[in-house]
Amino acid sequence: MTISPVSHNTRPESQLLPQEAAAFDLLDKLGIEYDRVSHDAAFNMELCAEVSRVLDVSVCKNLFLCNRQKTAFYLLCMPPDKPFHTKDLSAQIGSSRLSFAPEESLWELLRCHPGSATILGLANDTEHRVRLLIDREVCDAPFFSCHPCICTSTLKLKTADVLEKLLPHTGHTPVIVDL
């Protein structure tokens, strides 16, 4: 995988996809500073491990989930090395067994494609149909990482900015879980 060896604190100068431009616009509007690295598409956590080294941050694993009926949707932000057990998480949040949500729902609700699910996509969930679940370990870390709605770039944000600026703006209150 090709990764830019240099991180930047500005948006890319190249042409951006609409959802990517909207993510950077939101960060600018909220005064949230970030470090950014560009890279080849990172569709799995093994590739993201290389990005972690460049940005000096643990890249979050973001899973877009739903209940069996596909009536409740969840974005789970968790450490990359923690195992995910649907039964345990379902019990913590009082939901029926969870599974991965359909690709169409990911696009409809967060304006993201598979591999690029991100907390920044919650800005597109204006009807608040997605519940945000964050593992306690992620909340306790000083920095938070995510894609800007596209999997060819990764951002390093202050966790405090995510919790105190971004989420109040989107209107999503995180549910803290212990995986």
Stretches with model-predicted labels:
Residues 1-179:
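Extended, low-hydrophobicity, polar/charged segments
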